[in-house]
Amino acid sequence: MGDAELAVFGSAAPYLRKTEKERLEDQTRPFDLKKDVFVPDDKEEFVKAKIISREGGKITAETEHGKTVTVKEDQVLQQNPPKFDKIEDMAMLTFLHEPAVLYNLKDRYAAWMIYTYSGLFCVTINPYKWLPVYTAEVVAAYRGKKRSEAPPHIFSISDNAYQYMLTDRENQSILITGESGAGKTVNTKRVIQYFAVIAAIGDRSKKDQTSGKGTLEDQIIEANPALEAFGNAKTVRNDNSSRFGKFIRIHFGATGKLASADIETYLLEKSRVIFQLKAERDYHIFYQILSNKKPELLDMLLITNNPYDYAFISQGETTVASIDDAEELMATDNAFDVLGFTSEEKNSMYKLTGAIMHFGNMKFKQKQREEQAEPDGTEEADKSAYLMGLNSADLLKGLCHPRVKVGNEYVTKGQNVQQVAYAKGALAKAVYERMFNWMVARINATLETKQPRQYFIGVLDIAGFEIFDFNSFEQLCINFTNEKLQQFFNHHMFVLEQEEYKKEGIEWEFIDFGMDLQACIDLIEKPMGIMSILEEECMFPKATDMTFKAKLFDNHLGKSSNFQKPRNIKGKPEAHFSLIHYAGTVDYNILGWLQKNKDPLNETVVDLYKKSSLKMLSNLFANYLGADAPIEKGKGKAKKGSSFQTVSALHRENLNKLMTNLRSTHPHFVRCIIPNETKSPGVIDNPLVMHQLRCNGVLEGIRICRKGFPNRILYGDFRQRYRILNPAAIPEGQFIDSRKGAEKLLSSLDIDHNQYRFGHTKVFFKAGLLGLLEEMRDERLSRIITRIQAQSRGVLARMEFKKLLERRDSLLIIQWNIRAFMGVKNWPWMKLYFKIKPLLKSAETEKEMATMKEEFARLKEALEKSEARRKELEEKMVSLLQEKNDLQLQVQAEQDNLADAEERCDQLIKNKIQLEAKVKEMTERLEDEEEMNAELTAKKRKLEDECSELKRDIDDLELTLAKVEKEKHATENKVKNLTEEMAGLDEIIAKLTKEKKALQEAHQQALDDLQAEEDKVNTLTKAKVKLEQHVDDLEGSLEQEKKVRMDLERAKRKLEGDLKLTQESIMDLENDKQQLDERLKKKDFELNALNARIEDEQALGSQLQKKLKELQARIEELEEELEAERTARAKVEKLRSDLSRELEEISERLEEAGGATSVQIEMNKKREAEFQKMKRDLEEATLQHEATAAALRKKHADSVAELGEQIDNLQRVKQKLEKEKSEFKLELDDVTSNMEQIIKAKANLEKMCRTLEDQMNEHRSKAEETQRSVNDLTSQRAKLQTENGELSRQLDEKEALISQLTRGKLTYTQQLEDLKRQLEEEVKAKNALAHALQSARHDCDLLREQYEEETEAKAELQRVLSKANSEVAQWRTKYETDAIQRTEELEEAKKKLAQRLQDAEEAVEAVNAKCSSLEKTKHRLQNEIEDLMVDVERSNAAAAALDKKQRNFDKILAEWKQKYEESQSELESSQKEARSLSTELFKLKNAYEESLEHLETFKRENKNLQEEISDLTEQLGSSGKTIHELEKVRKQLEAEKLELQSALEEAEASLEHEEGKILRAQLEFNQIKAEIERKLAEKDEEMEQAKRNHLRVVDSLQTSLDAETRSRNEALRVKKKMEGDLNEMEIQLSHANRMAAEAQKQVKSLQSLLKDTQIQLDDAVRANDDLKENIAIVERRNNLLQAELEELRAVVEQTERSRKLAEQELIETSERVQLLHSQNTSLINQKKKMDADLSQLQTEVEEAVQECRDAEEKAKKAITDAAMMAEELKKEQDTSAHLERMKKNMEQTIKDLQHRLDEAEQIALKGGKKQLQKLEARVRELENELEVEQKRNAESIKGMRKSERRIKELTYQTEEDRKNLLRLQDLVDKLQLKVKAYKRQAEEAEEQANTNLSKFRKVQHELDEAEERADIAESQVNKLRAKSRDIGTKGLNEE
């Protein structure tokens, strides 16, 4: 974000982010990564220092304060590079440690940037002064910004939470923690302010209508003053410290609108009510009341305005400088009003507050000679009792003589003064705490609105970790809370980190850091933990703090690593045990913990409170039950537990609720830091800040970050910044992907490659590696800058020296001129010249003055004329301006209409998006319902099984009961045991009843959820969870019943006692059995109903899916219509922009009209007419746009109606479900039917198994057929091998091949199957690609035709526009003469233009008709393509036969190749000397390297060719690829059969001639054969057989080897000759080059012939296709023209009035026809010229090829010439296609002209018939030319076929040329080495000669310059001498 983007933050910008200048200054400061470090310091924790020396594991460094220190090397931590100074996210620091974090916060705080990110944290430091960063301008700037798009701020955290809530549909929470005074409360208020502002935007109208109660936003904001008044107080660190924790939930609707809010509070500091330290004070409300701002309060509460009159609130300070208690009282009272408190409620709260103050003033004294207390005055007690609505005497009696319960009786107990004082304080604290809780509940009731709410954002404001010298029970609760929150953060943080790694594809082993704190948490909250032991001790009356300590040590000391025995230090409070928290070790003092945990009250006084006449007080204590409260029968257990709930248990319960809330939300973390204890702005106390960083988990988060990869950079940014480290890794000229570039760059650097990972979009670094890269980058930059500086200094010095030389030369010239002037200034003629010169100028001046006067008169006259002209123009300009204003008004109206249309279009788009969202949501719901249905079906089956088991259990139970009837004798104790067991059964039955009700509620809930479709997904998920829980409970109950049955069986053996008692128990058991039966039946009914419901929901789901498909189809239609609407709108927008541009141009021209001429006025009028035309076009486009929008609206209304119908259907389905519910309850036979269905399904499965077996047998038969086909292929392969053996005349080797193939049969069978499968896949892919290619070509042709038609329509419209312009010009001339006549003509022209626009629309409709006909043609062509595919399959069947023919053809070609090779060898022998003497080093070097590669390739090809079996399989695999080529060859072979027969006859003659040579080569081959066999012996027997099958190839190799031997001998001879005379070699080289160039002409001529024939072939094919298309287009256009002609004849009468105008147009049309005719002829000439240029280019290409001197490079080019020719052919085809398109355009133009002529014929009636006949004759001529062209194309097709055959021959010849040229590479092998050496020597000598020559030339040049200067100087001297002599003689003569 640059400085310009920061401007949106206004005055807050400097407090949020550094400016660009500051960032540059920080980055350019001096820095040394190896020396700049942090060292530990006793006072400052860490200080910056520079390393001086290293020695023996220790480092000596100088701190920034100038102090020299020596520390261990492992204590030194590196500083971060300047790039990271004041970084906004500390997780991005490359060196992530404590001092780096501390100093980053310190530097940002010094710049007043108080917010900083630390990974997931936002750390904020209290500035202790007001900063302008919370204004409305800042709120608006942060709204909708992502975290990365704006500087750190609490508003950014808030907005991200709000946006996540809306987008992710998930509840959010913001956790704000920190010590007192760190700014938690302020930040909480800012968060609430932000939500109230952004969520209430757009709802302002309600604010104006609300009464004094205030809007919801106001109430949420005003809740803070009320809470602060009763819950905040001044502390040592903070003047407005919150003494309670709070969790504020702000609820929002589905659209993000504020719905409601509620507040939960934690750990209110009750002790502050009665006790404060010296520097602190009580809660604000006490001092606000005493401020006397509302005197009526003082009277009502019976108090003064002096705080020191009241003991409870005057123990510390009573005033705070930064707080105005009077104003705060008014704010509190106003908050109560806004929150809707009644006057009675406000007064009751004030009364209780005043009563507490009076409570503290009540005094008691000890009775004489007794230990009992008595009141010391009753005045304060009377006031307190009055305010509380109590009796004063009863209050005092209850305090001094409380009644306690002893046994079943109440007795009065005496209290001493200390006990009374404690009871008094406890009662005051209880009253205040309950009043505070009531106020919070009352605020929640106000904020609870009836508006629908979907999500909430929770704001947690709670105290941070506390480690004091004296830590008590309150600190344990706070620290336990923070331990849980830190565990929550750790788990959440690393889960997100892991998700980032997973998303980026980083391999990572999960580490659950949340478990790090589990040991400490378990120690506190688990059974037998600290809290549990504390609560246990509170239950024992004789327990003390010391017994509590003893239990702690017995259970945990030595057993838990987190529990330790403290070390007591003198001067510090005593500690009883220590806990190791994540923030550090805390020593706790347990004194008073039991009392604090029980928090007892004087129950006598509490009973008085319950009976108070003050309604609020009685309500506060109405639900209080003391420890001795009566226990009601049957419910005593619950009552007792609730009454004796300890503080620790209540805190744990609230904490668990809080953690549950937080786990269900997406959390955001804010950590508040207090910078110093003195509240000084801008001062950082390092130890204090470090302590808080440890306590609030920032450093813990850093520890987690260091385990992973904390630094990450996008690939593009990394490449851009660090490419300088190794530019060679990422070359500048070529494109390399950013990720690949980063990988190459990092792999090329000398760094640990385990320190980074590559993700999908980023590169991840371990901590410290990025700093190392920065250091390397700085070093690299310093070297580069040093080099640049040196070069720059050199350039500057040379420039300065050049200036000095130029200055010297200038001085010399000036000196020479001055000397010359001094020599001639006294010369008499010169003096005369000085006198006459001014006179000459004065005469010239007079002449100039005369001419200027004449010019002035003439200009004055012209000025008067121009002035008159200007006035005339001004008058005209006024009228034009008026017209322009009218036009602007019209344009504005059109723009308004367009804006309305755009708004409607936007609305349609929004509706479409909403529909898409609904469709998506419904799809998701359907998927969830299907999943639920599947799960419920499975559960249903499971429950059915369980029901059957239960039935069996019941049967067993009946048998057991029958046996029990016979068992009589048992003791009464056994009967009692049985009774207890039956009571357990009662409980089980009660549980089952509850579960049944829960199931019914879940069922009803599911039905309700069906009504509300928006909540269906969530409610179904909840119902699923509930059902799973119920199923688990049922399983548990079944297990219990099984246990009961076992117990009963055991009891059966024992129950042989009393028959009467057992009979009674039997009766009870029978009743229980009946009840269980009834419940099980009901359970069955319910399960059946659920199953029916599931089936209905499945049916409903299928219906919804159908509806969804219909909606999707409708949405697609809407999208297509919207796309059309967008295109129309784009056209209108373009037209509007053109109009605006034209309007601006007219305005500019009108402004410059003062100097305009009549031509400019005409232009303005012309533009005006164009505006009229465009305005009418815009109006028509707008009407069309509105019609389209109306259609879209109609379709949208239809879709909405359909959705409504769907909702109605759903309602009907719901009613149907409710009706069928009762019917399905009676269907008990479903289980049996299900069994029958299962049996049927089993039978079906057996049938399916049989069918599968049949299919398997069919597949086996197919496999056998495949095996037979493989065997056939194997036999064919053997046959081919036999043929090869016969051709090579080696029968013995053939027999070995057959035996070898027999052994490899099994292996090749599998290979053939694989290859056959690959062949089928490739054939399918090829067919699909061919089909797609044809379709694409056809579509392309259609699109091209449509484009051409649109272009023609556009040209037609342009012609109409130009015609309209000419008509406007005529009307304008008429308007100047006669305004009335001009008006009529304009009206007629308007009608004419309207008619023409209508014609254009009809033309568009005709184009649409063409499109439909093209679509039909497309379908027809697709059918043809399918037929062609059938033909292709047939051709595949003939592939085997063609393969055999191809091999025979290959034999013939091989013989011709052999003949060509022999002729080529003869040619080579004549060129040996030329090639051996070739010394063109650079070309030979490249060609030699390439030739080596080709040689290796050739050898590999020989080896591959020798593998005959693999060749055969490869041919099978590649046959699919060459199907089309084989088809062409098949056609060519039939045509070339006769030619080949004649060629065979010639070949036989040549073969006889070559047999002798073959025999000689055979002898030499036998010698080399042994060596080849030795090389091939390592291969398989397959290689041996293949070698024999290719003897002819080996023969050719033998000839090449022979040539190589001869060339080697020749090379030795040439070597000696070259050593003798290098100059003679160069002469021979040039001669050899010429010979080589001539030798290559034959190859090039063949290539040129191939090129020409290929071009002709492709041109003919393309021309044929184009002609076919043209014929179809012409036919369709003729039909359209005939239809249009009939329509035009109907409007003859309407066009009669424009006959004169039509005559003029006819003349213009005839001229255009002539012009187009001339253009057509010129295009034909141009085509011929281009053909000539093409042939010339071909000849130039041939000449360029002939200039190639290197034989090897020529061979390479011979191989690649085919591709080059194909490219050139493509270019020429494009040119031809372009010419054909031009031709079609001309034909279309002719058709258009014919159409125009028909039009003109109807307009002109008789006058235009002759012209029409001429045009028709011209059209017929063009048609004749078209026929001639078609005949030519037919002839070219015939020539094309001949050329194809010739191309094939040339292709084979070219391939042989390539192979021969490759063989030649070995011939120059050793020669090149010598040539290189000689060439190198020659180059060195030449280089030395060039050097000497350049030196000589330089000296020669300097000598010539010196001679020239000497000559010039000498000539000057001679001239001067001559002049001096002349002057001397003249002086003598004068004397």
From Swiss-Prot:
What positions does the domain Myosin motor occupy? Answer: 85-778
- Region (Disordered) location: 1907-1935
Coiled-coil intervals: 839-1935
> Chief localization class?
cytoplasm
Q: Where is this region: Actin-binding?
A: 655-677, 757-771
Compartment list: Cytoplasm, Myofibril; Cytoplasm, Myofibril, Sarcomere
| Residue(s) carrying N6,N6,N6-trimethyllysine | K129
Instruction: List all Basic and acidic residues biased stretches.
Output: 1923-1935
Q: Where does ATP bind?
A: G178, E179, S180, G181, A182, G183, K184, T185
Q: Which InterPro entries match?
A: IQ_motif_EF-hand-BS, Kinesin_motor_dom_sf, Myosin_head_motor_dom-like, Myosin_N, Myosin_S1_N, Myosin_tail, P-loop_NTPase, XRCC4-like_C
Domain writeup: Limited proteolysis of myosin heavy chain produces 1 light meromyosin (LMM) and 1 heavy meromyosin (HMM). HMM can be further cleaved into 2 globular subfragments (S1) and 1 rod-shaped subfragment (S2). The rodlike tail sequence is highly repetitive, showing cycles of a 28-residue repeat pattern composed of 4 heptapeptides, characteristic for alpha-helical coiled coils. Four skip residues (Skip1: Thr-1188, Skip2: Glu-1385, Skip3: Glu-1582 and Skip4: Gly-1807) introduce discontinuities in the coiled-coil heptad repeats.
Q: Which family does it belong to?
A: Belongs to the TRAFAC class myosin-kinesin ATPase superfamily. Myosin family.
Q: Name the job this protein performs.
A: Myosins are actin-based motor molecules with ATPase activity essential for muscle contraction. Forms regular bipolar thick filaments that, together with actin thin filaments, constitute the fundamental contractile unit of skeletal and cardiac muscle.
Q: What does the subunit section of this Swiss-Prot or TrEMBL entry state?
A: Muscle myosin is a hexameric protein that consists of 2 heavy chain subunits (MHC), 2 alkali light chain subunits (MLC) and 2 regulatory light chain subunits (MLC-2). Interacts with ECPAS. Interacts (via C-terminus) with LRRC39.
Q: What is this protein called?
A: Myosin-7
Name of the encoding gene: MYH7
